[in-house]
Amino acid sequence: MSARVLQVHEHTWTPADRAELQIRSLPVDVPRDVEALRIDLDVAANVGSVIDLGAQSPRGYVGWSGGARRQIVISAEWSTPGYLPTHGYAGTWQVLLGLHRVPADGARTTVTVRESNAGEVARLRALEPADPPVPLRPPRRTLPSSSGLTWLAADFHTHTVHSDGSLSVG
């Protein structure tokens, strides 16, 4: 039995679309009886196209995999790495597309959202590499902070013409 297709979005994105709004939301109405979701992103072969993928449930952010994945599955028990296991599917979801790189002649995408099931979730989970073991770590050092404030580690960086970006810093 094939999985029920809930929504198909086909679009050719242009540089003007990217300039207007870099992250696009594609709505998908998900009925109550859905056990799990599978989202497939097909980007037509076009040199220079980079389209990122993410998802948002009616309750909020579920995940983002950037341009690293073209298929994701979301269920209450397990979801593709980069996505939170999520339950309570009914309502309007958003498939998020990041228009990271759109060539002058456009980037044609087809997004297909299907109902999935426990068997498919287990099959896709088995294809993922096992989680690496968590290394033993020494206790964290404490840093001085004002009452109620906490130090957080962060990684501030940018992608420019000096690496894999297309814009300059200035």
Predicted regions and their residues:
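Short alpha-helical segments and helix-capping/turn motifs at coil-helix boundaries
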Residues: 24, 79-82
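Noncatalytic modules at the cell exterior or secretory-pathway interfaces
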Residues: 35-41, 84-107
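Residue-level recognition of well-ordered beta-strand positions that form the cores
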Residues: 29, 40-42, 54, 96-98, ...
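Extracellular interdomain linker/stem segments of modular secreted and single-pass surface proteins
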Residues: 115-120
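Solvent-exposed, flexible loop/coil segments flanking beta-strands in beta-rich domains
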Residues: 1-44, 140-145
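Edge beta-strands of jelly-roll/beta-sandwich modules across compartments, strongly enriched
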Residues: 49-51, 103-114
